[in-house]
UniProtKB/Swiss-Prot annotation:
Swiss-Prot/TrEMBL catalytic activity: Endohydrolysis of (1->4)-alpha-D-glucosidic linkages in polysaccharides containing three or more (1->4)-alpha-linked D-glucose units
Descriptive protein name: Alpha-amylase
Residues the entry annotates as binding Ca(2+): N116, R173, D182, H216
Positions marked as site (Transition state stabilizer): D313
Protein source organism: Pecten maximus (King scallop)
């Protein structure tokens, strides 16, 4: 009996942290959510932009068959019908081609994965691969799942089978999230169908998974399923590599379910991160208070989290809430994103949105009939045809390279004016200064950088020989003078050794 207990403990220890490594190619550290993009457009973006600019990877929208909903809202992608790989984003062949092309340029693919539930209960119809479904009888022959494969009144004790009491952990995990048919993940058959789907994606070459609604699943069920996942495709990643798993756990405090229950499995999404930074960069909390940003603010360990300013849900006022900054407020949004990318806390994810009417938060991606529009690229590298593409804003993609260059370097040389002007360095690799105050910043600061002329990667870029924006001269003593107008569209300056005149341009 004792040997069995010891063996079980060893399995738990072996699993802990196994799925927390983002599996980026060397020198890359940031992923971007290309929300509702087609697979063909993602493949092109990997080759023409993400690879050359040092991005680690792409979070893609759920690739499995989903319910067809009138007017095609974005959230139909989060109502599975089967695990067939056919959606508005494209076919399985197009998905396979995209994954292969992105991996060839060192850009990894992370699949948004919906395994807590199927469609909403009630009604019937077909999915994006033509599979029939019936939410009245809980019949999903495309998997197949039947009524036996869902939680019932034996597991869920709310009056209508829906979640109402967020102070009741059992109800949160055993009942229906907004009337979505809740899978019985304690059942081996259900687990096997889910892991077969995830393993198929691994075999196609994905690097990992975002687990949607992880908070609504028991950690033990997730451990059991993830323990049977394949290693990553050895032709791409080498042998013995595990997929990266990051779990959507909305933990704003005050509820019985905490993110810490899931950090032993993989990473968790840190929603408080974006909410708190939003308060600072809207000038609701002094920027000087960021001097101890991270765990000292009551947030989880840096190695346990994926951090972000906004995501596809909370930019629409859905899950997570808290009024995060979004692309609708570009000035503070760029500042907050630059701070996130310059600071060592967490593994960073960017949001890449499409334009939508804020009075219609259900609005789906730019489309022509049932077809998602192509992503078109303007002369200034921004996107057209209804796509916002925050990841293509210069102030953001240049900071992706900044993060790559300074990775592993300690935060040092912190300076602030006690209010809304701050600056800090990352070892001897990079330095950033920001001014959110109501007056100009005019300071000589210690950067920690080697002497030379650096290109500010906020106001411009470095092409390997010259700067298109501001130049900053660092003296032999490491000091440099910074002048930042409080009325600037981008009141910040960032420099790093990969954008130093007289040396090659480096992004990873």
């Amino acid at each position: 009996m004792l040997s069995l207990i010891i063996a079980a403990c060893c399995v738990t220890v072996a699993l802990a942290g196994t799925f927390s490594n983002p599996t980026c190619a060397p020198g890359r550290n940031t992923i971007v959510h290309l929300f509702e993009w087609k697979w063909t457009d993602i493949a092109k973006e990997c080759e023409r932009f993400l690879g050359p600019n040092g991005f680690c990877g792409v979070q893609i929208s759920p690739p499995n068959e989903n319910r067809l909903v009138n007017n095609r809202p974005w959230w139909e992608r989060y109502q599975p019908v089967s695990y067939k790989l056919q959606t508005r984003s494209g076919s399985e062949d197009q998905l396979r081609d995209m994954i292969s092309r992105c991996n060839r340029v060192n850009v990894r693919i992370y699949s948004d994965t919906v395994i807590n539930h199927m469609t909403g209960v009630g009604g019937s119809g077909t999915g994006t691969a033509g599979s029939h479904w019936n939410g009245d009888t809980l019949s999903y022959p495309g998997v197949p799942f039947s009524a036996w494969d869902f939680n019932t009144g034996n597991e869920c004790h709310s009056s209508d089978m829906n979640i109402h009491d967020y102070n009741n952990a059992e109800e949160i995990r055993n009942c229906r999230l907004v009337s979505l048919a809740d899978l019985k993940l304690s059942k081996n058959y259900v687990r096997e169908e889910i892991t077969q789907y995830m393993n198929h994606l691994i075999d196609l070459g994905v690097a990992g998974f975002r687990i949607d609604a992880a908070k609504h699943m028991w950690p033990g069920d997730l451990r059991a399923m993830f323990g049977t996942l394949h290693d990553l495709n050895s032709a791409v990643f080498g042998s013995g590599r595990k997929p990266f798993i990051f779990q959507e756990v909305i933990d704003m405090g005050g509820e019985p379910i905490s993110a810490s229950e899931y950090t032993g499995i993989g990473r968790v999404t840190n929603f408080i991160f974006g909410v708190k930074l939003g308060q600072v960069f809207r000038n609701e909390n002094k920027a000087s208070n960021l001097h101890n940003w991270g765990e000292a603010w009551g947030m989880p360990n840096s190695n346990d989290v994926v951090v972000f300013i906004d995501n596809h849900d909370n930019q629409r006022g859905h899950g997570g809430g808290g009024g995060p900054l979004t692309h609708f407020e570009p000035r503070p949004y760029k500042l907050a994103t630059a701070f996130m990318l310059a600071h060592p806390y967490g593994f960073t994810r960017l949001m890449s949105s499409y334009n939508f009417d804020r009075s219609n938060t259900d609005q789906g991606p730019p489309h022509n009939g049932d077809n998602i529009n192509d992503v078109t690229i303007n002369a200034d590298l921004t996107c057209g045809n209804g796509w916002t593409c925050e990841h293509r804003w210069r102030e953001i993609y240049n900071m992706v390279a900044f993060r790559n260059i300074v990775m592993g370097q300690n935060l040092q040389h912190w300076w602030d004016n006690g209010n809304y002007q701050i600056a800090f360095g990352r070892g001897n690799k990079g330095f950033i200064a920001m001014n959110m105050d109501n007056h100009n910043l005019d300071q000589t600061l210690q950067t920690g950088l080697p002497a030379g002329t650096y290109c500010d990667v906020i106001s411009g870029s470095y092409d390997g020989s010259s700067c298109s924006g501001t130049e900053i001269q660092v003296g032999n003593d490491g000091n440099a003078h910074f002048s930042i107008s409080n009325s600037s569209d981008d009141p910040m300056i960032a420099i790093h050794v990969g954008a130093k005149k007289g040396q090659p341009k480096v992004t990873t």
